[in-house]
């Protein structure tokens, strides 16, 4: 077998492979022999059909099968011999494909980039330090109460924060428009759910009252047919309801799975959850900075095949998340290109750090992470057991732990500065990272 390799770009390889005719004929004859042993042809006993008849009937099919198999097997032999690491399936172009001649074909493919990750000591990390105070717990209790607000009907004019039940009919230039009318809509005034000016115009209205309001759609409104236009809405207020915050009592605590301990028991449970959220937020922000530093300090080219595969995965995830009748391949690839490339870059860099530092998942940390996740459930022991019975889920946790170990490895050499902040600032979501 003859092999030659040409580098057509940084990652693309064009490999020409020649397979001797003798090897081809050996594979063809092997298939014909197998066919002869089981062929059923009228006038001949099974296994007694002359080879000339077998060749006449089956040689073409046997040759095509042999050539297809040889291309697969010789491609694998060639990349092993040439020490190449393809990043995707090759594009195969036959050059000589004739009976009685050596097979020659060209396989074009991308390879994984070869690089070493460096520059750990140049990465700057700001590690947040925070704690959950009593005031933070008080604030969280108020948030939980507001999230469980109930509205009770009142006989007074509507105020900001009240919930009104309304019917409305909207028109532009005297003509009704799609989505401009509804009945029985529940609307909390001041929530910003409707276009600017709509909710403000209903403050002071009473049940049974009808108001005509004329708000203007924003210039950047998602429906371009309505953007910038002034509409006239005839709104009928059916009812007004005032918000009622629930009391901190046993009934309220039970909604969150806390059955005993009263207010102090509930506060302790809330604080425990907040501390878990805080640890995770700080860890995530440190990890993001580490990954940003690794990407910035190790610019690499990535195979288009890997990016395309990641784009397809992101398309599928988007359809699963947002639903609808759209198919994944109907979503423009450009929407996901930057995110996909960044994921591929990070994946290759993290894998290289694991390889260079010879890292393996710390099983004690795997167990610790599973137990921490399980603690959020009512029966944590069952959750832990479930993870250890599901190999796929367990391997996902191991991958997370391995990434954490990569972060720890970088932190040992990076420039780390601790910064004391409030709980609220520590858990605030970070800005989205820039594309690689």
Swiss-Prot record:
Its EC number is 5.2.1.8. Involved in protein export. Acts as a chaperone by maintaining the newly synthesized protein in an open conformation. Functions as a peptidyl-prolyl cis-trans isomerase. It catalyses: [protein]-peptidylproline (omega=180) = [protein]-peptidylproline (omega=0). Keywords: Cell cycle, Cell division, Chaperone, Cytoplasm, Isomerase, Rotamase. InterPro entries: PPIase_dom_sf, PPIase_FKBP_dom, Trig_fac, Trigger_fac_C, Trigger_fac_C_sf, Trigger_fac_ribosome-bd_bac, Trigger_fac_ribosome-bd_sf, Trigger_fact/SurA_dom_sf. Consists of 3 domains; the N-terminus binds the ribosome, the middle domain has PPIase activity, while the C-terminus has intrinsic chaperone activity on its own. GO terms for molecular function: peptidyl-prolyl cis-trans isomerase activity; protein folding chaperone; ribosome binding. It comes from the Bacteria. SUPFAM superfamilies: FKBP-like (SSF54534), Triger factor/SurA peptide-binding domain-like (SSF109998), Trigger factor ribosome-binding domain (SSF102735). HAMAP family: Trigger_factor_Tig. Its main location: cytoplasm. One of its GO terms (biological process) is protein unfolding. It holds the Pfam family Trigger_N. It is found in: Cytoplasm. The keyword rRNA-binding does not apply. Residues 161-246 form the PPIase FKBP-type domain. Belongs to the FKBP-type PPIase family. Tig subfamily. This is Trigger factor.
């Amino acid at each position: 077998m003859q092999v030659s390799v040409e580098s057509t770009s940084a990652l693309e390889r064009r490999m020409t492979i020649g397979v001797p005719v003798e090897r081809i004929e050996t594979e063809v004859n092997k298939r014909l022999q197998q066919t002869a042993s089981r062929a059923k042809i009228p006038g001949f006993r099974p296994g007694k059909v002359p080879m000339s008849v077998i060749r006449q009937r089956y040689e073409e099919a046997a040759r095509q099968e042999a050539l297809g198999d040889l291309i697969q097997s010789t491609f694998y032999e060639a990349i092993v011999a040439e020490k190449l690491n393809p990043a995707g399936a090759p594009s195969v172009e036959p050059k000589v494909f004739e009976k009685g001649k050596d097979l020659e074909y060209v396989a074009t493919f991308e390879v994984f980039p070869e690089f070493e990750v460096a520059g750990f000591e140049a990465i700057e990390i700001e590690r947040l330090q925070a704690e959950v105070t009593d005031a933070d717990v008080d604030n969280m209790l108020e948030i939980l109460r507001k999230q469980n607000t109930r509205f009770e009907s009142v006989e007074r004019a509507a105020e900001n924060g009240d919930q009104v039940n309304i019917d409305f009919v909207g028109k532009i230039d005297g003509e009704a428009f799609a989505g401009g009318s509804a009945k029985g809509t529940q609307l909390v005034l001041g929530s910003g759910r409707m276009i600017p000016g709509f909710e403000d115009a209903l403050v002071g209205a009473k049940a049974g009252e009808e108001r005509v309001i004329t708000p203007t759609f924003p210039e950047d409104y998602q429906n371009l047919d309505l953007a910038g236009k002034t509409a006239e809405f005839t709104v009928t207020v059916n009812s007004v309801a005032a918000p009622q915050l629930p009391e901190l009592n046993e009934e309220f605590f039970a909604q969150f799975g806390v059955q005993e301990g009263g207010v102090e028991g509930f506060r302790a449970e809330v604080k425990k959850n907040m501390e878990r959220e805080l640890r995770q937020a700080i860890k995530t922000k440190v990890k993001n900075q580490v990954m940003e530093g690794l990407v910035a300090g190790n610019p690499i080219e990535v195979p288009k095949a890997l990016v395309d595969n990641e784009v397809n995965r992101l398309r599928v995830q988007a359809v699963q998340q947002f639903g609808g009748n759209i198919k994944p391949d109907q979503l423009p690839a450009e929407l996901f290109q930057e995110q996909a490339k960044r994921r591929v870059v990070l994946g290759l860099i993290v894998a290289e750090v694991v390889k260079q530092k010879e890292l393996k998942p710390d099983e004690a940390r795997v167990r610790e992470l599973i137990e921490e996740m399980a603690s959020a459930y009512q029966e944590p022991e069952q959750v832990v057991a479930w993870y250890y019975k599901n190999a796929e889920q367990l391997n996902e946790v191991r991958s997370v732990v391995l990434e954490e170990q990569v972060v720890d490895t970088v932190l040992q050499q990076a420039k780390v500065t601790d910064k004391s902040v409030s709980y609220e600032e520590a858990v605030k979501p970070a800005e989205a990272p820039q594309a690689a």
